[in-house]
Each structure stands twice: as structure tokens, then as C-alpha cells.
């Protein structure tokens, strides 16, 4: 019977084979026609790679079937060494969770009146509820970097 073998270049070659022929025999016939060594050949039929020890009838290859020939690639990517670091990995900063933190920002006097202890940032991008840090000489917003400095009275 006659089968077709399509190579990578798109060229189709015809082979005269028997259903009892092994895949090794087919590869040897391809070597005679194309000069490609059998150990570099991979034959594909119906999406499956054909194994050397089996016959054409095992794969249900009939007359005028087309096999696809691809070349076997040896090896793979170069192995890379695992990096070893001399210094330990730096820990990511974790914010401290303070329970009832809002109590730091307000104070209730004996009359029940609420006073703000910290200044709220007036910038539009910060919005309500963003307080400025109180330093000895300034108020500073950590979100928008707005700073208000205090005037120091000059000593004479």
C-alpha cells in the first residue's frame, strides 16, 4: 500500500509499505529518500507520536494516509544555579493595629463637649478624617505632605 509523509518543508514523499511494517522500517525508508537519520525522526499520525516497536496496523494507518515528519529536538534549556543571598531577606513593614485609636484624636470635657486634639487636614485630596501629625514646631499631613510651621517669638 502507499502512504504519504509530509516533511517540515511542506514536501510530500510517497512510500510503499505493508500494514505489518514497523515504524522503524518506515523511518528507514524515509532515511533512504531524505537522508534524515531515524533517531532524529518523529512521525505523527492523528495527533499521536508513533512508537518504533509498533506496526502501521496498530495505529490503523491505511492506504493513502498522511504521516507528518518532525525532527526530534535534543536537550532543553540550560540549567540555572539557584541564587544564594548573603544577607537575609528584609521583612516588610507591618502597620501597628491600635485598638480604639480614634480616642487619641478627640477629648470629651466634663460638660460633654467634644474637642479635637489634632488638626484635620484641609486639603481636598485628603478628605474628612485625615489628621495632621503634631510635631514640636509644625503640623504635618502624611497623606498630601502639607506642612504648617509655627511662628517662634524671637527673644530680645
UniProtKB/Swiss-Prot annotation:
Which Pfam families does the protein's record reference? Ribosomal_S27, ubiquitin
The keyword Nucleus is annotated on this UniProt entry: yes
Q: Could you tell me which SUPFAM superfamilies the record lists for this protein?
A: Ubiquitin-like, Zn-binding ribosomal proteins
The record places the site described as Interacts with activating enzyme at 54, 72
Q: Which UniProt keywords apply?
A: Cytoplasm, Isopeptide bond, Metal-binding, Nucleus, Ribonucleoprotein, Ribosomal protein, Ubl conjugation, Zinc, Zinc-finger
Q: Which CDD domains match?
A: Ubl_ubiquitin
**A GO BP term, please?**
translation
Q: Which Gene3D superfamilies match?
A: 6.20.50.150, Phosphatidylinositol 3-kinase Catalytic Subunit, Chain A, domain 1
> C4-type zinc finger positions in the chain?
121-144
Q: Where is this cross-link: Glycyl lysine isopeptide (Gly-Lys) (interchain with K-? in acceptor proteins)?
A: 76
> Per its UniProt entry, which superkingdom is the organism in?
Eukaryota
Q: Which GO terms describe its molecular function?
A: structural constituent of ribosome; zinc ion binding
InterPro entries reported in the protein's UniProt record:
Ribosomal_eS31, Ribosomal_eS31_euk-type_sf, Ribosomal_zn-bd, Ubiquitin-like_dom, Ubiquitin-like_domsf, Ubiquitin_CS, Ubiquitin_dom, Ubiquitin_ubiquitin-like
A cellular-component GO term for this protein? small-subunit processome
Q: Where is this region: Disordered?
A: 75-95
Q: Where is this site: Essential for function?
A: 68
Covalent cross-link (Glycyl lysine isopeptide (Lys-Gly) (interchain with G-Cter in ubiquitin)), residues? 6, 11, 27, 29, 33, 48, 63
Q: Where is the Ubiquitin-like domain?
A: 1-76
Q: Further remark, if any?
A: Ubiquitin is synthesized as a polyubiquitin precursor with exact head to tail repeats, the number of repeats differ between species. In some species there is a final amino-acid after the last repeat. Some ubiquitin genes contain a single copy of ubiquitin fused to a ribosomal protein (either eL40 or eS31).
Family from the record = In the N-terminal section; belongs to the ubiquitin family.
Q: What is this protein called?
A: Ubiquitin-ribosomal protein eS31 fusion protein
Organism expressing this protein natively: Ictalurus punctatus (Channel catfish)
Encoding gene per record: rps27a
Amino acid at each position: 500500500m502507499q502512504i504519504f509523509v509530509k516533511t517540515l518543508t511542506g514536501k510530500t514523499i510517497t512510500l510503499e509499505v505493508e500494514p505489518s511494517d514497523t515504524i522503524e522500517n518506515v523511518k528507514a525508508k524515509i532515511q533512504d529518500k531524505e537522508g534524515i537519520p531515524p533517531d532524529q525522526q518523529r512521525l505523527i499520525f492523528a495527533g499521536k507520536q508513533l512508537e518504533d516497536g509498533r506496526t502501521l496496523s496498530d495505529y490503523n494507518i491505511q492506504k493513502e494516509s498522511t504521516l507528518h515528519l518532525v525532527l526530534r529536538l535534543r536537550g532543553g534549556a540550560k540549567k540555572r544555579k539557584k541564587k544564594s543571598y548573603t544577607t537575609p531577606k528584609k521583612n516588610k513593614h507591618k502597620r501597628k493595629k491600635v485598638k480604639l485609636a480614634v480616642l487619641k484624636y478627640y477629648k470629651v470635657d466634663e460638660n460633654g463637649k467634644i474637642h479635637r486634639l489634632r488638626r484635620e487636614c484641609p486639603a481636598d485630596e485628603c478628605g474628612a478624617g485625615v489628621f495632621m501629625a503634631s510635631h514640636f514646631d509644625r503640623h504635618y499631613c502624611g497623606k498630601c505632605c502639607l506642612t504648617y510651621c509655627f511662628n517662634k517669638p524671637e527673644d530680645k
